[in-house]
Amino acid sequence: MMFLRNHNSVGGAIRTAVVLQDLQFIVSNKSSALTGAVSSVHRQQIRTMSSTSNETMHNKFDLPKRYQGSTKSVWVEYIQLAAQYKPLNLGQGFPDYHAPKYALDALAAAANSPDPLANQYTRGFGHPRLVQALSKLYSQLVDRTINPMTEVLVTVGAYEALYATIQGHVDEGDEVIIIEPFFDCYEPMVKAAGGIPRFIPLKPNKTGGTISSADWVLDNNELEALFNEKTKMIIINTPHNPLGKVMDRAELEVVANLCKKWNVLCVSDEVYEHMVFEPFEHIRICTLPGMWERTITIGSAGKTFSLTGWKIGWAYGPEALLKNLQMVHQNCVYTCATPIQEAIAVGFETELKRLKSPECYFNSISGELMAKRDYMASFLAEVGMNPTVPQGGYFMVADWSSLDSKVDLTQETDARKDYRFTKWMTKSVGLQGIPPSAFYSEPNKHLGEDFVRYCFFKKDENLQKAAEILRKWKGSS
């Protein structure tokens, strides 16, 4: 207490001030150290909590189990590739020229209709005028009266028709037979519904000379072995994408007999139904004895009228099967665009008046595509590829393996050769195709690695450019 006794002297006051300053400095330093220590602990706690919180949120918002294992669609990747490198694009399946003018005019008229309801919601299961037109067409084609209100469903493209069919009929543990190669959405749609896909590949029965898509066949014993009490569904695609195979009556009868034996639903994806080349014939499996009651058939306005961007499709079949699709549709999409449905209805009404005439678009389109098919098959063979000549559709697969010495596959890192080939061709040669291994299940992807898929529904001038690009590439050192 010395500083109190010296309080009244100047020296004492100075000493007192110094001591007080020292005490204040000590207290201040200890306080700062304590505050710093607390702050450090607090920051660490925040970091730990933040890390735990982020991890918890990450786990909570992971992709649902029913979609886990799915990979990025080949279309997402290759559309981006085309946008970046700007090749001549023979990859995606769409025409690069205008659809029938009457369809475009009909859409403009519907959108500009004086009736305000023309641009409002329409009937959820299909615009009345469109389902009437679809009923009239398919009643003729399958030789039975189809009820437009209960046996036809209009969807957002054939994609949604497939989705509604699979979601509406496949339950947990149901087995679904898928023929390979297949349109790439089949497998993930089945898995998302809780189904178990069972695969069987089409394989060429010869390797030399001219190969037709008819030469790609199923092993009937292998197919029969896949059917059992758990089999709910088989998906067929005729005309086929990507091979262009048109299943003949004998092949369809094998499928039909197995479906009847095991009480299995047949989903027939027939979006290329009007693109069948002479002398081949498109046979609808629902017309075979005992098959109407167990078949859902899927079609597409995008393919029928060459209007892929309009995204309108449909399913038709017996009411007992269609009601399941309606339930999925009403709780997923509910209704499709009214003006587009109106325009497509006008398109069907136009073609129904001349259905048996060569001027009918459904009839003329196959002749137009056949010439393009023959030209592509010729120039692919000329440069050393071995094309499979399709019976229908507008795609062609070709074996490029004899040209592998002209391709530097080391520049790409993909696991599959056809991915490396198509990416290298896109970047280095300026021509884009699609890798067919994308259309196979994982165990069978090797079956597509030596092939590339090209679309020949393009302007003649662009097909000629493709031929020139390949000839130049083939002739380079």
UniProtKB/Swiss-Prot annotation:
Competitive inhibition of L-kynurenine transamination by glutamine, methionine and histidine but not by tyrosine and phenylalanine. Cysteine concentration between 0.31-2.5 mM increases L-kynurenine transamination while concentration above 2.5 mM inhibits L-kynurenine transamination. Keto-acids as amino acceptors modulate the transamination activity toward L-kynurenine. The modification N6-(pyridoxal phosphate)lysine is found at residue 303. Belongs to the class-I pyridoxal-phosphate-dependent aminotransferase family. Its cofactor is pyridoxal 5'-phosphate. The keyword Transferase applies. Substrate binds at residues 44-45, 453. Pfam families: Aminotran_1_2. Coiled coil: none annotated. Its main location: mitochondrion. The keyword Nucleus does not apply. Optimum pH is 8.5 and 10 (with pyruvate as cosubstrate). Glycans are attached at residues 54, 205. Pyridoxal 5'-phosphate binds at residues 121, 158-159, 241, 272, 300, 311. GO terms for cellular component: mitochondrion. Expressed in developing ovaries. Expressed at high levels in the head. Pathway: Amino-acid degradation; L-kynurenine degradation; kynurenate from L-kynurenine: step 1/2. This is Kynurenine aminotransferase. GO terms for molecular function: kynurenine-glyoxylate transaminase activity; kynurenine-oxoglutarate transaminase activity; pyridoxal phosphate binding. Optimum temperature is 60 degrees Celsius (at pH 8.5 and with pyruvate as cosubstrate).
